[in-house]
UniProtKB/Swiss-Prot annotation:
UniProt similarity note: Belongs to the ATPase epsilon chain family.
HAMAP family with a match to the protein in the record: ATP_synth_epsil_bac
Cell compartments where the protein resides: Cell inner membrane
Gene Ontology cellular component annotations, sorted alphabetically: plasma membrane; proton-transporting ATP synthase complex
Membrane topology field: Peripheral membrane protein
UniProt-listed InterPro entries: ATP_F1_dsu/esu_C_sf, ATP_synth_F1_dsu/esu, ATP_synth_F1_dsu/esu_N, ATPsynth_dsu/esu_N
Gene name tied to this protein: atpC
Organism: Acinetobacter baumannii (strain ATCC 17978 / DSM 105126 / CIP 53.77 / LMG 1025 / NCDC KC755 / 5377)
Function: Produces ATP from ADP in the presence of a proton gradient across the membrane.
Annotated keywords: ATP synthesis, Cell inner membrane, Cell membrane, CF(1), Hydrogen ion transport, Ion transport, Membrane, Transport
GO MF entry, a single one: proton-transporting ATP synthase activity, rotational mechanism
NCBIfam families hit by this protein: ATP_synt_epsi (TIGR01216), PRK00571.1-4 (NF001847)
Name under which the protein is recorded: ATP synthase epsilon chain
Amino acid sequence: MATMQCDVVSVKESIYSGAVTMLIAKGAGGELGILPGHAPLVTLLQPGPIRVLLENGTEEIVYVSGGVLEVQPHVVTVLADTAIRADNLDEAAILEARKNAEQLLANQKSDLDSAAALAALAETAAQLETIRKIKNRAQ
């Protein structure tokens, strides 16, 4: 099966580097499926899960808060603002953060409070979507 080199990097660390058969991510125009030999492409990433399909048929799922996806025919690079392996996401902490953001939104005192609360809600929604992908994979 054909493969391509994939690198998923955050500001803090390299999350994944190796051969993959496919990468699935949410770009600016919607969900993208990248296979070896894909036409060159650069797009902004939307917050949410990135699915990396490995040669052995297994799948890695990584949460990204946003960033850039660069595709070359045999190399795909994810430069993420924040990237966390989905297995390392703490669902209880995310639910607590969502609750806090909802309270902040309900008690907003300024447009800045509202913007911060909406950003936090969007981030927690993307993290919970990533957790759901992991749970679906396990079934």
